[in-house]
Amino acid sequence: MIFGNINYDKTNSVLPEDIKKCFEYAKENNLLDFEKGFHVIDGDDFFVNIVGYDTTVKEERFWEAHRKYIDVHLMLSGEERIALNFIENLEQKEFQEEGDFLPLEGDAVNSEVVLRSGDFLVCYPEDAHMTALKAGEEKSSIKKAIFKVIIK
C-alpha cells in the first residue's frame, strides 16, 4: 500500500513507472470531466474506472482485493475513508476471475486512510481494502479515478 498526493512531484519521482503513468495521465486529462465508467488507456494492461458515489458506514460495505491488477485510487472530489488490512488477516472467499475480484470477510482493520482531492492510494494484491466509508459524521459525495495497472 502506498498513500500520497499527486502534487508531491519530488516524492512521487521514486515510485514505479507504472504508477507514475497514472499520474501523468491524470495531469494531462481533466478526469473530473470524464463520464463514469471504464476508459481504456492501453488495452487490458492499463485503464481507468471513473466512479462516483456517496460514502457510508462500514456495515454497508465489504472487503476486496485483486490479483491481476494494481489499484491506484485517485480522489477527484469529496472525501472518503478507506479501511486496509492484509488479505491473510481476513477470510478469503472464492476469487472471481471475471472482474479480478477477491471478496474477503472479517472485522479486523489494520489501518485507515482518508482520501481528499489529489490524494492517492495504491493497493497491491496483498492489500485488502474497504472503500466508500464516510470520513466523518456526514456522508460525502465523491468522484474518484481508479486506475487499473496489470501486474506483469
Put a short name on every predicted segment:
Residues 114-134:
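Conserved metal-binding segment of the jelly-roll/cupin
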Residues 1-47, 65:
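A short, N-terminal "cap"/entry segment at the start of jelly-roll beta-barrel domains
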Residues 79-82, 128:
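Short beta-strand segments in beta-sandwich/barrel cores
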Residues 72, 111-113:
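Short, surface-exposed secondary-structure edge patches
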Residues 72, 120-122, 139-152:
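A short hydrophobic beta-strand segment most commonly corresponding to one strand
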Residues 68-70, 74-80, 88-89, 97-102:
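Glycine- and acidic-residue-biased ligand/ion/polar-headgroup-sensing regions
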Residues 38-57, 68-77, 84:
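A short glycine-rich, His/Asp/Glu-containing loop-to-beta-strand
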Residues 68, 105-110, 132:
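Short alpha-helix capping/helix-loop boundary micro-motifs
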